[in-house]
Amino acid sequence: MTGRRTALIAVAVTVLACVLAWAFLARMYAIPSSSMEPGLQAGDRVVATLLTPDPFPVRRGDVVVFEDTKGWLPGGGHVIKRAVGLPGDTVSWTPGEQTLRVNGVPVDEPYLAPGETPAQEAFEVTVPAGRLWVLGDHRSASADSRAHRAGPGGGFVALDDVVGRARFVVWPLDRIGGAGADPDAFAAVPDAPAPEERT
């Protein structure tokens, strides 16, 4: 009887530990639209690891979940996009070019929806301190940083609003897998220059 009781206690402690880990380290989010296709599709459920107490900073190419504090969505809530520009980065696109440029370096984005160009209109932005520049992978169907340049925050997302990084698709079952983070696409991009180095 003692062995059985010990086993039940061990199972209960394990279940409790999993519930607590879920509550404090991860959350599930639903993908509401096609803006992150083809990697994430409308109706997918993704698990995001929370940034607090995550010791690792957001990287270029990470798929991030952030709280909508700037009115991007009619009812507020959470938004999921790809982090393309980190604080200090200059992100640009010129019509006719096949790639975005980050800090002057062309970035091949293999996660883009088929047939997509990196953007529909020319832009060049330098990301302020404590902010991110985010884009959807289905660029022509994504109201991302580009669409909100004239709004509060200038289209930039505050790092303080980022709640986590999408890690896994967990539903539907036939789509279980990674959530599409691709920091390797940005491997050749140099760090942003220090403010005094900019001209």
Listing of model-derived features with the role each one plays in the protein:
Residues 6-24:
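Hydrophobic membrane-insertion alpha-helices, especially the h-region
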Residues 1-2:
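N-terminal Lys/Arg-rich, disordered targeting/topogenic segments
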Residues 8, 24-30, 38-199:
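Soluble "head" domains of membrane/secretory-pathway proteins
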Residues 33:
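A short acidic/basic microdomain associated with nuclease active sites
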